[in-house]
Structures are given as structure tokens and as C-alpha cells.
């Protein structure tokens, strides 16, 4: 009964994530709009020198599975295939020098902006995750260890916490793979609960890019692939970020 109700509550349609989607989808001339290469997007997104804190680094709370699989993927980055993505406290830090189009940037004097999945600052208590991206294959792997502050059913991660991280990983992958910026839809089917403090591996793939949209899929499962936690699909709108003016 718990599983049935869990699956019923978990249906998400038109979930908005990285930024809220505008009501009207702008039409653009595709031949000229999306000229940024994956390499240039990755270079901007992953600065080599920065004073910003990277939250996607190992800490004492990581379980042995999380640590060992992290090391495996870190080794794969040396061959030039995979890239470890840094994770700063806000997406504003990832897109420095750029602004949202159509005046969507909000004006505020608040300084402590935080990405939802980086809002819990205590190590091991909330989201512990790291994303690896493969540019040529347009896919990502996210290693996720939910902490006790993400609990839903006693001892297990809330379904919404997984949904949020799926959307976050989708958004990063969509942007780097094809300048995908807004979540148009996110559909999830939950299969099993994730124990708090354990590792879940999210495999995300760009299925196709068509008609100004990126179509993507994700499966969240245990490291040995014997337990599937959830499957999802997402659609993202391609929308090019604008250069900020020198006066800003």
C-alpha cells in the first residue's frame, strides 16, 4: 500500500527546475542561434581557476560505494572522455558573464543565493552528489547519496528529493549538450525507495535534439544495477544565454 501511494504521489508533469519556463516559447532561427560548441560551453561552465567552493568533492560523510565509484570516474576523466562537473552554491556562479534572455533575470539585493540541491550546508545531511559528463556521447552520470534531512518514509529518501536531483542533472546535461535551459516536462515512475546514506547512480542520456527541444531519459539504480529506484524522461527548451553588458 505504501508503495502504491508513493508511486501515485510521485507523478510529476511539467515540473519546472533550473529556471521557470516562460509561458510563451520563443521561436528562433536555429541556423544562427545555437552556435556555441560543447567544448566552449564546458569551458565556461567548468572554470579552471576559481575561488568558488566546489561542493562536488568527497567529504567524510561519503559511503564507501560513493567514494570508490567517484574514484573510478575520476580515473576516466584522465583519458579525455568524461568530465567532472564542479558544483557551486548557485547557478549564477556557473553562468557568470551571461544573463537570461527576455528580461527573466530578477533584480534583488540578496546575496546568499543557493541552488535547491545545495541548500543544506551540513555535510552528509542533505544532498551529496557529483555529476560526470561525457561531451561526445551527450550523457551524464550522477552519484547521489541522500542524507537524513531528505527522509520521506522512515529510513528512506523522499521521492521529491530524487525528482529534484534528476531535474538538476537533466538541466546541467541539457545545457552542456545543446544549450537546453528550461524544463518543459519531467515524468517519473518510481520503482523502489532509496535507503538514506546509500548510493544511487543516475544515468542520463540525451535521446534526440529536435524542434528546439532536447529529449532526455534517466534511470536511477543501485551500483550493481540490481535495484531500479526510478525511471524518468524530460524535455528541455533550447534557449541561448545572452552576454552581459559591460555596465552590469
From Swiss-Prot:
Subcellular location per the Swiss-Prot or TrEMBL entry: Mitochondrion matrix
Keywords: Fatty acid metabolism, Hydrolase, Lipid metabolism, Mitochondrion
Active site per the UniProt annotation: 167 (proton donor/acceptor)
Principal localisation: mitochondrion
General function of this protein: Has acyl-CoA thioesterase activity towards long-chain (C16 and C18) fatty acyl-CoA substrates, with a preference for linoleoyl-CoA and other unsaturated long-chain fatty acid-CoA esters. Plays an important role in mitochondrial fatty acid metabolism, and in remodeling of the mitochondrial lipid cardiolipin. Required for normal mitochondrial function.
EC class (word): hydrolase
Subunit structure: Homodimer.
Cellular-component GO terms for this entry: mitochondrial matrix; mitochondrion
Organism in which the protein naturally occurs: Mus musculus (Mouse)
Keyword Isomerase: no
Reactions this protein catalyses: hexadecanoyl-CoA + H2O = hexadecanoate + CoA + H(+); (9Z,12Z)-octadecadienoyl-CoA + H2O = (9Z,12Z)-octadecadienoate + CoA + H(+); tetradecanoyl-CoA + H2O = tetradecanoate + CoA + H(+); (9Z)-octadecenoyl-CoA + H2O = (9Z)-octadecenoate + CoA + H(+)
Molecular-function annotations in GO: long-chain fatty acyl-CoA hydrolase activity
One biological process term in Gene Ontology: fatty acid metabolic process
UniProt record similarity statement: Belongs to the THEM4/THEM5 thioesterase family.
Observed phenotype of the null mutant: With increasing age, mice develop fatty liver, due to impaired mitochondrial fatty acid metabolism, and impaired remodeling of the mitochondrial lipid cardiolipin. Mitochondria contain increased levels of monolysocardiolipin, and decreased levels of linoleic and linolenic acid. The altered fatty acid metabolism leads to decreased mitochondrial beta-oxidation and ketone body formation. Mitochondria show abnormal, elongated morphology, and their function is impaired.
InterPro entries, A to Z: HotDog_dom_sf (IPR029069), Thioestr_dom (IPR006683)
EC identifiers of the protein: 3.1.2.2
Protein name as it appears in the record: Acyl-coenzyme A thioesterase THEM5
